[in-house]
Curated annotation (Swiss-Prot):
UniProt remark on domains: The N-terminal domain interacts with the head of the 30S subunit; the C-terminal domain interacts with the body and contacts protein S4. The interaction surface between S4 and S5 is involved in control of translational fidelity.
Domain S5 DRBM: 10-73
Natural source organism: Clostridium perfringens (strain 13 / Type A)
Function: With S4 and S12 plays an important role in translational accuracy.
Designated name of the protein: Small ribosomal subunit protein uS5
Origin organism lineage: Bacteria, Bacillati, Bacillota, Clostridia, Eubacteriales
Leader sequence segment: none
Name of the gene this protein is made from: rpsE
Keywords annotated in UniProt: Ribonucleoprotein, Ribosomal protein, RNA-binding, rRNA-binding
Classification via InterPro entries: Ribosomal_Su5_D2-typ_SF (IPR020568), Ribosomal_uS5 (IPR000851), Ribosomal_uS5_bac-type (IPR005712), Ribosomal_uS5_C (IPR005324), Ribosomal_uS5_N (IPR013810), Ribosomal_uS5_N_CS (IPR018192), Ribsml_uS5_D2-typ_fold_subgr (IPR014721)
Quaternary structure and interacting proteins, as annotated: Part of the 30S ribosomal subunit. Contacts proteins S4 and S8.
Amino acid sequence: MRIDPSTLDLKEKVVSISRVTKVVKGGRNFRFSALVVVGDENGHVGVGTGKSIEIPEAIRKGIEDAKKNLVEVSIVGTTVPHEIHGKFGTGDVLIMPATEGTGVIAGGPARSVLELAGLKDVRAKSLGSNNPRNMVKATINGLANLRTAEDIAKLRGKSVEEIIG
């Protein structure tokens, strides 16, 4: 199910900008690549990349791409329902629930994703690559795979009490 970005009040955050080079016969062609995260701080977050000769244009393309890749995040209160591993390439991020008042404890790129997803109390640990693109995509992968007890109960056709035990 695709999420319509026009109905959401999205905020964007540029995670990284890098200069990339294409070597051709006549010399080097320089461009800028931007990694952008968008979210409504209410359970929706997406990541996108843009590339252009100028930085603002690369960021704009990244925002457009991120709006096409929105995912819904299960949030329980101000944290995640359970611990989860997110993986993408060599990026490996462990996302853990935290008690209220803890805040967002996460490194660089993962922090941007968690804040824009609307999580207020959560801990995250990067266990794999610290490449921003892999870290961001691993975090999004983990958040997309979160399920609340209600979701699981509905899928199994049971009550929440039967699931929790």
